[in-house]
UniProtKB/Swiss-Prot annotation:
Region Disordered: start-end pairs: 457-493
Stretches with biased composition (Basic and acidic residues): 457-468
Naturally occurring in which organism (per UniProt): Homo sapiens
Post-translational modification: Phosphorylated by CDK. Phosphorylation by CDK takes place in late prophase when the cap exchange is prominent. is important for the stabilization of telomere attachment but dispenable for the cap exchange.
Domain Myb-like: 666-719
Clinical disorder: Spermatogenic failure 60: An autosomal recessive male infertility disorder characterized by non-obstructive azoospermia, due to sperm maturation arrest before the pachytene stage.
Recorded coiled-coil stretches: 398-446
An example Gene Ontology biological process: double-strand break repair involved in meiotic recombination
Designated name of the protein: Telomere repeats-binding bouquet formation protein 1
Compartment list: Chromosome, Telomere; Nucleus inner membrane
Placement of ARM repeats on the sequence: 101-144, 339-382
Signal peptide: none
Keywords: Chromosome, Coiled coil, Disease variant, Meiosis, Membrane, Nucleus, Phosphoprotein, Repeat, Telomere
Length: 727
């Protein structure tokens, strides 16, 4: 596979070298040069590495000079077309061509009496050089190229005679459309405030276009240009409103909405105009008063009900409604009067689109105050005298105004109910988390206290434990058990110390005050009894050796209010029921191994091993094991252990601090320069996958030892210094 790729790459390089030689030695043959340029364009389009290689062998600069110096128009057109395609394919070629000299040459082509095709190719090259390139946006303004583009925008086609069936008119329209697209990239992506300020001088001409022609071929480019020039620039938005642009857009939107009932294309085109209106009022909600004169809200609601629109188009309409009603009570009332609020609630409850739901919530939030005012009475509605008279006239014409008020109350109640449900869910979630955390802390403190009392009375517990014939495994709450599952070493002692029955009696007698203080903990245990019963029944028999019905008895006795009485009654019933079962004789075997292995031959080594392997240690032997573990832990920390001089036959695990001591120094990696193929792989990978360095590393055959961070550093280095090819 690699040999085939290498062979194709070599063939591509050979072809480009031959084609470049053909361009150089066929200066008198315009047709041959055109064919060679078209072939170069085709090769560069098929192989992304071809553009890089063509730039390296000097072909890019030769074609640039050829476009300027050739006497044949067809060669100039082909050369510009090839330059644009190569720059569009490779960002480094774009940066190489992005010079003031080339912009001046392109400006001369556009200003001179050149044919339509040459001007189109010149505009195409400008479009490619400016797109996603702030340097290109600056040069297109400083060289005066944007001035020539503005003049072409005004004069290429006539506003009154637009017959696209005519071949000459259609070619002029194609040039005008390319100019619109180029102006769009001059002002946006990235946003350029200075170019936006310059292009706003074209707004009056754009308004004339919208007034005289409502065909999609004109409205779509004009709306794209206006929307991108207005975007995120409040000064330009104010200027657009001052020259009557918002009024013109409103009139066009009204006409398209009226036509949308008959043609689907009008509905789609109305959405395009709606997006442009939204771009104008998004940062200045007060401009919504202009839209209220044309009752745009009612038109948008009617357009929203159009069945042919998808969710994205409906979202644009709803977002525009939100900006219209954000700071304009007239539009809010218009929305309410045209049953817009029920429509928003229906969209909120039925739609599964998250963005659509957010837009509907935005509209409902804007209309909350006006809904409250209308739900009270007409007299309390705070409009001036003229507006009050208007409302009275409306009430005369509409006999069902009371029905509107009733709907307003219902809608307001529904909004408050939705908000209240959301707040209650949030409060319940926070209370649940607080209860869980407080319960876990209380239970852990209780176990620590009980464990300390149990160790202090170890000898007494041993005497009492020997007089009884069974052991009862106590249960733990969900919080402690989850901790025991995740960290066995930390919870080893509490699990072992929870076995003896009489230890529970002693703890109940001497910790009565503690149980009373922890009554809230007992209540939490009562709430999780069902979970504990299931959890205990599924646990390992090696740890829990009590019968299954113990959990049932506990559940029945939990309602007792006194914690001490609760614990005593449960233990008494468990002891009586347990001694009566046949398993009593079997449970006698579950005793401390240190107590029942007296007759066996034991020494210091096997006795310690026997105690550590026993899950049922008595208090005395448990204290012995803990003391031995502490002693051995201190021994491991001593100087002898750190020097790896071990007195025990078994090798223990190295201490954690040993790995952090400065010992060996990591071996430095051998430097490997990036080859040409690796650089090509890197560019191709970034183009296809973006900045996902791991994916690029595994997708291409880089040298052994390459890492993702190497690719990232190399790409950023090439971006800043394109001349560095391999380092």
């Amino acid at each position: 596979m690699e040999s085939e790729d290498t062979k194709k790459t070599q063939e591509m390089k050979t072809d480009l070298n031959l084609l470049l030689e053909c361009l150089k030695y066929q200066m008198d043959n315009a047709f041959s040069q055109k064919e060679a340029l078209v072939t170069i364009h085709s090769i560069c389009q098929q192989n992304s590495n071809a553009s890089v290689y063509f730039r390296e062998i000097g072909g890019l600069m030769f074609v640039k000079n050829l476009a300027k110096s050739s006497e044949h128009s067809m060669v100039k057109e082909a050369a510009l077309y090839t330059l644009g395609a190569i720059a569009e394919k490779n960002v480094y070629c774009q940066q190489t061509l992005c010079t003031s000299e080339l912009f001046e040459d392109l400006t001369w082509f556009l200003s001179n009496d050149s044919n339509i095709n040459l001007k189109r190719m010149s505009v195409y090259v400008i479009l490619v050089l400016v797109s996603n390139n702030r340097t290109g946006q600056t040069l297109v303004r400083e060289t005066g190229c944007i001035t020539v583009l503005s003049r072409l925008f005004r004069t290429v086609i006539s506003k009154h005679e637009l017959d696209l069936s005519d071949k000459n008119v259609f070619q002029s329209y194609q040039l005008w459309s390319s100019v619109c697209s180029t102006l769009c990239v001059c002002v946006n992506n990235p946003q350029n405030d200075e170019n936006q300020m310059f292009c706003c001088s074209l707004f009056p001409h754009a308004n004339e276009w919208l007034k005289n022609c409502t065909t999609p071929e004109i409205i779509r480019p004009i709306c794209s240009f206006i929307g991108l020039t207005l975007a995120n620039n409040t000064y330009v938005q104010k200027y657009f409103v001052s020259v009557g642009g918002l009024d013109v857009l409103s009139q066009v939107l009204m006409q398209l909405e009226s036509d949308s009932h008959e043609t689907l294309s009008s509905a789609k085109l109305a959405v395009v105009v709606t997006k442009t209106v939204d771009a104008c009022i998004a940062d200045n909600p007060t401009f919504g008063i202009v839209l209220s004169k044309y009752h745009i809200v009612s038109k948008l609601l009617a357009l929203l009900l159009h069945e042919s629109l998808d969710s994205g188009e409906k979202f644009s309409i709803m977002l525009t409604l939100g900006h219209c009603t954000e700071d304009c009570e007239e539009n809010q009332y218009d929305l309410f009067k045209n049953n817009g609020l029920p429509l928003m609630i229906q969209a909120l409850t039925e739609s599964q689109n998250e963005e659509l739901n957010k837009a509907a919530t935005f509209v409902l939030h804007n209309c909350k105050k006006i809904t409250e005012k209308l739900s009270l009475s007409l007299g309390e509605y705070p409009f001036d005298e003229n507006e009050t008279q208007q409302l009275k006239d409306i009430s005369v014409k509409e006999n069902n105004l009371e029905e509107h008020w009733r709907k307003a109350k219902e809608i307001l109640h529904r909004i408050e109910q939705l908000e209240r449900e959301g707040n209650e869910e949030e409060i319940q979630r926070e209370n649940y988390q607080d209860n869980i955390s407080s319960m876990n802390i209380s239970i852990q403190n209780t176990w620590k206290h009980l464990h300390a009392d149990r160790i202090g009375r170890g000898s007494k517990a041993e005497d009492e434990d020997k007089s009884h014939s069974r052991q009862l495994q106590s249960y733990k709450s969900h919080g402690v058990m989850s901790k025991a599952c995740t960290n066995d070493d930390q919870m080893k002692t509490p699990l072992k110390s929870a076995n003896p029955v009489h230890a529970c009696y002693r703890e109940s007698e001497q910790n009565k005050t503690l149980y009373k203080a922890k009554s809230s903990c007992n209540q939490n245990l009562h709430e999780e009894t069902t979970f504990e019963k299931n959890f205990v029944s599924q646990s390992s028999d090696h740890v829990f050796k009590h019968p299954v019905h113990i959990a049932k008895n506990i559940k029945q006795q939990l309602p007792v209010t006194d914690p001490f009485t609760l614990c005593s009654d449960i233990i008494n019933k468990e002891v009586v029921s347990f001694l009566a079962t046949p398993s009593c004789s079997e449970m006698l075997t579950y005793r401390c191994s240190g107590c029942i292995a007296v007759e066996k031959s034991l020494n210091s080594r096997n006795f310690s091993k026997l105690l550590h392997s026993c899950p049922y240690q008595c208090d005395r032997h448990k204290v012995i094991v803990e003391a031995e573990d502490r002693y051995k832990s201190e021994l491991r920390k001593s100087l002898i252990c750190n020097k790896k001089i071990l007195l025990t036959p078994r090798r223990r695990q190295r201490l954690s601090n040993e790995s952090t001591t400065p010992g060996g120094i990591k071996k430095r990696r051998i430097r490997k320069n990036f080859t040409e193929e690796e650089v090509n792989y890197l560019f191709n990978g970034v183009k296809k996958m973006g900045n996902h360095w791991n994916s690029i590393l595994w997708s291409f055959p880089f040298q052994q030892g390459r890492k993702a961070v190497d690719l990232a550093h190399k790409y950023h280095k090439l971006t800043k210094h394109p001349t560095c090819a391999a380092s």
